[in-house]
């Protein structure tokens, strides 16, 4: 009798669990997947990882994982915007708003932004319509417009260049776009800032481990200091050590982009530093975390605050604060490389 009661009890439990499971599943299945609204802030032209990261974003948008609201640029050369527009057009998104700054920082065209002017038989190899610098709006205007039109606490910003644009945004007053100041607008609209900047481990150099003053920081130290000190939402930093340990396999450049006779990502990579060079994926890691923060691609430090020193060194202090930095295991590294290659090389769907 005891055995019969136990069996009956178990049967009722299983049946109840099944009913509960059946009742919850349709609700979960019907819940729409909301693409993550992304703003991409980049110094495109100074290194090729920016270009691969932009290609990633377009692949993620096709998959329904994100929606690119705007691209703002911190490299002060007009070809940076033209090449960005050419890449966006290649992926069928030539209408994405693009904004620039006039900072005087890295004014050279760079090794591959010249692809924006490359012609074959008199026609642009990579068509685009952003050719006159006078028609390109200021980055702060583009940022304020994108944020003002977004839902509250929804936008993720992937900053993979200097902090110039976002520091200027914080200091912007209310205007016809929004009565809110830049800092108020960020606090109301931004969910997360995922940024490639700084270094949170010592870096190997000539057989020694040394402090590293990272490029994106040192090119505009005051802006980086402002951002670290005043940004009002959570920040996750992808330090120099992360991308350094996740190299993009050059075999992918040689083999995975051949579905078209000319590919802006592959050609930019080759012009910057051709195979057999495996380029670190600094900027791509920030984009991957921005869109997939809960997929386990990376671990996180404890919460705290980041301070940017006068010489560009970044230091992290655990405790109260909304800032963390990425950490990476060997097992995660393998998975991250696979994700970055698959996304960067995904053919456009126009």
Segments predicted by a language model, with ranges:
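Bacterial N-terminal signal peptides
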Residues: 9-20
């Amino acid at each position: 009798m005891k055995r019969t009661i136990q069996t009956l009890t178990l049967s009722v439990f299983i049946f109840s669990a099944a009913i509960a499971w059946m009742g919850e599943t349709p609700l979960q299945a019907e819940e729409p997947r909301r693409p993550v609204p992304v703003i991409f802030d980049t110094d495109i032209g100074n290194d090729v990882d920016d270009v691969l990261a932009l290609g990633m974003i377009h692949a993620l948008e096709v998959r329904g994982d994100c929606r690119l609201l705007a691209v703002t640029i911190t490299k002060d050369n007009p070809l940076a915007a033209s090449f960005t527009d050419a890449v966006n057009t290649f992926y069928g998104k030539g209408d994405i708003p693009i904004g620039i700054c006039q900072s005087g920082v890295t004014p050279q065209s760079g090794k591959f932004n010249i692809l924006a002017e490359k012609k074959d038989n008199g026609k642009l190899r990579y068509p685009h319509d952003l050719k006159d610098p006078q028609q390109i709006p200021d980055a702060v205007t583009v940022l304020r417009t994108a944020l003002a039109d977004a839902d509250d606490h929804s936008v993720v910003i992937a900053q993979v260049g200097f902090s110039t644009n976002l520091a200027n945004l914080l200091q912007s007053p209310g205007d016809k776009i929004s009565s809110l100041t830049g800092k108020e607008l960020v606090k109301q609209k931004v969910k997360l800032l995922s940024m490639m900047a700084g270094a949170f481990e010592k870096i190997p150099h000539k057989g020694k481990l040394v402090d590293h003053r990272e490029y994106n920081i040192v090119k505009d130290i005051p802006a980086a200091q402002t951002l670290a000190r005043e940004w009002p939402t959570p920040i996750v930093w992808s330090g120099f050590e992360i991308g350094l340990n996740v190299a993009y396999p050059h075999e992918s450049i040689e083999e995975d982009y051949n579905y078209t006779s000319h590919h802006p990502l592959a050609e930019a990579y080759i012009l910057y530093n051709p195979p057999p060079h495996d380029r670190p994926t600094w900027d791509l890691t920030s984009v991957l975390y921005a869109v997939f923060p809960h997929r386990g691609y990376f671990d996180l430090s404890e919460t705290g605050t980041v301070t940017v020193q006068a010489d560009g060194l970044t230091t992290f202090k655990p405790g109260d604060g909304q800032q963390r930095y990425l950490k990476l295991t060997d097992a995660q590294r393998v998975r991250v490389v696979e994700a970055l290659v698959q996304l960067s090389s995904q053919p456009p769907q126009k």
